[in-house]
């Protein structure tokens, strides 16, 4: 019995897709958690945001100088954030993801965008998320976010070198 070349092609393609699916690993899972955080943030729901954090998760948020170290405080932060930045969205930039067994760190930058008084505004910020594996989920145990600082000013030029004063002439020898 002769098999169709289409069956062979289909087999090769499906095997390749299965290999790609199997290749997804912890780094991709952590990247997906970052995207999930951004999607949930855009929903402006403090309860859902808080659920992404571990019970002992810590948040140093962009909009507050206060560290939040329990679920009630994390939720209060997002209640205030969603009032301050109505209908805010976040777009992730470059991410550096490192996975150490059941712990992962995602460091990078993101930009918050929102509209207030008819004007679209943005806040570029840098972040670090630390995750711990909890069953099949990654939970945030530490999240630091701070507004991106303004670029440093160029250093002032060094003062121009001045010539040293001429040495006084040596006294004439006595005669």
Named regions from a protein language model:
Residues 18-55, 72, 151-175:
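Short, low-complexity N-terminal intrinsically disordered segments enriched in polar/charged residues
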Residues 78, 92-97, 110-112, 126-132:
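Hydrophobic/aromatic beta-strand elements that line small-molecule binding cavities or substrate pockets
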Residues 124-149:
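Short beta-strand edge/turn micro-motifs at domain boundaries
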Residues 102-112:
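A short hydrophobic beta-strand element
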Residues 97-104, 119, 131-137:
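A short, structured loop/turn motif at beta-sheet edges
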Residues 27-33, 46-100, 121-122, 149:
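A solvent-exposed, acidic/Ser-Thr-rich amphipathic alpha-helical stretch
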Residues 1-5:
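Positively charged n-region of N-terminal signal peptides that target proteins for export
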Residues 7-18:
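Bacterial N-terminal signal peptides
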């Amino acid at each position: 019995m002769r098999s169709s070349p289409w069956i062979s092609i289909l087999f090769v393609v499906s095997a390749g897709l299965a290999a790609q699916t199997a290749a997804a690993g912890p780094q991709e899972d952590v990247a997906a958690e970052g995207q999930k955080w951004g999607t949930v943030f855009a929903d402006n729901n403090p309860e859902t945001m808080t659920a992404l954090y571990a019970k002992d998760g810590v948040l140093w948020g962009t909009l507050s100088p206060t560290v939040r170290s329990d679920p009630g405080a994390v939720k209060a932060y997002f209640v205030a954030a969603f009032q301050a930045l109505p209908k805010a969205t976040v777009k992730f930039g470059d991410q550096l993801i490192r996975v150490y067994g059941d712990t992962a760190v995602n460091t990078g930058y993101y930009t918050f965008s929102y509209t207030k008084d008819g004007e679209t505004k943005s806040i570029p910020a840098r972040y670090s998320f630390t995750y711990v594996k909890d069953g099949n989920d990654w939970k945030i145990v530490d999240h630091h976010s701070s507004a991106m600082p303004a670029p440093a000013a160029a250093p002032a030029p060094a003062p121009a070198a001045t010539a040293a004063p001429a040495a006084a002439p040596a006294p004439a020898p006595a005669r």
